[in-house]
Design a protein with these regions (language model features):
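Thiol-/selenol-based redox modules, centered on thioredoxin-like
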Residues: 163-207
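N-terminal "domain-start" segment that seeds a small globular fold
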Residues: 24-27, 37-74
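N-terminal Lys/Arg-rich, disordered targeting/topogenic segments
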Residues: 1-10
Length: 207
């Protein structure tokens, strides 16, 4: 009788190897800077507020583009995401946060390609207004999407309540782990968010 254990097919081995290569740096970034603060360099802290008690995987959100096409299940996979969940009107505070996210991403230089920005409008009408506020010529990387989910399963229901005009950070595995409530000192926000992102990008470098 042949008792040799069955070996996984080469394709599966390759998939598992790629999965490990991608996920381990992200997990290491969490471990060093958030789960085990004692491992950080002296004086290092994070600027944003960590999601308590732990990072939360995003649910299946029904997000659609201006043509009504679904964004796809892989929207939040493979990149760090700065997410803004809009209200019925993108007033001055809303616009300030979108411009802030642009400046932060630009400051990352070559690492900017590893970070995406998303504006989630509550409906198609608000999305159309947002497209006029944030034209592609000024915000070529900004993903503008409308939330078509049913009540109780929308982005606004998932992300932390009571934090209007906040920026939410989602990791490349699709977990919401940090929130940045707006502050009066926009320069402090710019420096603080940028510093957090640079730490995470450095610790999770995979290419």
């Amino acid at each position: 009788m042949n008792t040799t254990p069955a070996q996984p097919p080469p394709q599966r081995k390759q998939f598992l190897l790629l999965l490990a290569i991608f996920t381990l740096p992200v997990l290491a970034a969490y471990a060093v800077y958030f789960l085990f603060p004692g491992l950080r360099p002296t004086g290092t802290t994070n600027y944003g507020q960590l999601v308590a008690p732990a990072a939360r995987p995003l649910p299946a959100l029904d997000l659609r583009d201006a043509d009504g096409k679904p964004a796809g299940a892989g929207l939040f996979k493979g990149k760090w995401s700065m997410v803004y969940v809009g209200a019925a009107d993108c007033a001055q505070a809303c616009q300030t946060e979108i411009y802030l996210s642009r400046q932060v991403r630009t400051s990352l230089a070559l690492n900017a390609r590893r970070v995406q920005r998303l504006y989630i409008a509550p409906d198609a009408q608000t999305l159309a207004a947002a497209k006029a506020l944030f034209p592609p010529a000024e915000h070529p990387d900004l993903l503008l999407l409308a939330d078509a989910g049913a009540p109780g399963s929308r982005a606004a229901d998932f992300f932390q309540p009571g934090q209007p005009d906040a920026l939410y950070m989602v990791d490349p595995l699709g977990n919401w782990f940090m929130v940045y409530p707006p502050k009066a000192d926009q320069n402090a926000d710019f420096k603080g968010i940028g510093k957090d992102l640079k730490k995470l990008l450095n610790q999770s470098q995979v290419d």
